């Protein structure tokens, strides 16, 4: 008997693409009918069912090993907690003191970095101010040189240029037709 991909997919509980993938993994010879549909034999279906059941069993076994590993993690956590509780209070105080000294050093270093950043910014501002003053001096010197060299006489026009230009008068249409 011949079976098509959708029937096998329903039987296995997977998608039709998964059926084709399983057939390729098992190196089954897959035939196609004249419409391009895959056709499987009863032997192919049996092999795919066995393979699928085997994969399901493996996934269940891996889940049980994951549960066992999570139990081991919980045991390790309890061991760490007991070790931490067994540490003497003297050791705890020493660790707290070391932590305090480290935080103080970090605070001092942050303040020093902030001071250096402020110094750099003020230096840059002073440099920019000095450059601006030099530019102002140059501009003033150029203005003085221009006033000495070339006296500029600007006479305001009584009318703007667009009003001064006279537009040619248009002749009347009748005159232009007769050439007058």
UniProtKB/Swiss-Prot annotation:
Transmembrane segments: none annotated. Its main location: cytoplasm. SUPFAM superfamilies: Influenza hemagglutinin (stalk) (SSF58064). Residues 5-25 bind DNA. Keywords: Cell cycle, Cell division, Chromosome partition, Coiled coil, Cytoplasm, DNA-binding, Sporulation. GO terms for molecular function: double-stranded DNA binding. Disulfide bonds: none annotated. It is found in: Cytoplasm. Residues 67-151 form a coiled coil. One of its GO terms (biological process) is asymmetric cell division. Required for the formation of axial filaments and for anchoring the origin regions at the cell poles in sporulating cells, thus ensuring proper chromosome segregation in the prespore. Binds in a dispersed manner throughout the chromosome but preferentially to sites clustered in the origin portion of the chromosome, causing condensation of the chromosome and its remodeling into an elongated, anchored structure. Belongs to the RacA family. This is Chromosome-anchoring protein RacA. It comes from Bacillus cereus (strain ATCC 14579 / DSM 31 / CCUG 7414 / JCM 2152 / NBRC 15305 / NCIMB 9373 / NCTC 2599 / NRRL B-3711).
């Amino acid at each position: 008997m011949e079976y098509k991909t959708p029937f096998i997919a329903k039987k296995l509980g997977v998608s039709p693409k998964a059926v084709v993938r399983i057939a390729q993994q098992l190196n089954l010879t897959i035939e196609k009918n004249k419409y391009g549909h895959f056709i499987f034999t009863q032997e192919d279906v049996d092999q795919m069912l066995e393979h699928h059941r085997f994969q399901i069993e493996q996934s269940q076994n891996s889940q049980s090993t994951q549960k066992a590993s999570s139990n081991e993690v919980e045991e390790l956590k309890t061991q760490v907690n007991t070790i931490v509780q067994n540490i003497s209070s003297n050791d705890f105080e020493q660790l707290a003191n070391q932590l305090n000294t480290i935080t103080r050093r970090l605070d001092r270093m942050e303040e020093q970095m902030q001071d250096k950043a402020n110094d750099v910014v003020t230096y840059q501002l002073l440099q920019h101010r000095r450059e601006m003053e030099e530019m102002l001096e140059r501009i003033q010197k150029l203005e003085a040189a221009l006033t000495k060299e070339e006296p500029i006489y600007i006479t305001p026009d009584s009318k703007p240029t667009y009003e001064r230009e006279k537009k040619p008068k248009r002749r009347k249409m009748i005159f232009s037709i007769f050439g007058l």
